[in-house]
Amino acid sequence: MALNPTHLLWLDMEMTGLSPESDRIIELAIVVTDADLNTVAEGPVLVVHQPDAVMDAMDSWNRGTHGKSGLIDRVKASQLSESDAEAQMLEFVKQHVSPRTSPMCGNSICQDRRFMARHMPELEAFFHYRNLDVSTLKELAKRWRPGLCDAFKKSNKHEALADIYESIDELRYYREHFIRAE
């Protein structure tokens, strides 16, 4: 497969909390789209094993959210280490884009990037230093076009693959209703 410099790598991760210093990655997924946001390839959805001590340290929001989705049980059953997950994702993305060509795409993607820089640095280094953060458009729309955000309803599943597709759909929405091509 030929590498395409215009393809975008969309990422989402679920973590045990918000601090890269004390919390860990427990799920990640990547989707490749073309520049028009059409899906080109869907990467693996990887659930990373974490020790009981890490899982037991989660706050009530994370325990409730990841318990309800079944992710806690999948993490406990997983045999996949962070380094093996990183290697699998690198193998996948290298089939679609050259290193440092695609921005990291997603919602509140800076948070994912912080975790990746700490726990999966080779994968983080594969992305361009720029981010395509859909939440930036959401924040601008809230301020400049109040009410526009209300029409796009998110399911807030907090499952990596579902969240990626929701982010892509949200960017399509903003492209149609907020960013006017002339």
From Swiss-Prot:
The active site is at Y129. This is Oligoribonuclease. Pfam families: RNase_T. It comes from Thiobacillus denitrificans (strain ATCC 25259 / T1). The gene is orn. One of its GO terms (cellular component) is cytoplasm. GO terms for molecular function: 3'-5'-RNA exonuclease activity; nucleic acid binding. CDD domains: Orn. One of its GO terms (biological process) is DNA metabolic process. 3'-to-5' exoribonuclease specific for small oligoribonucleotides. Belongs to the oligoribonuclease family. The keyword Cytoplasm applies.
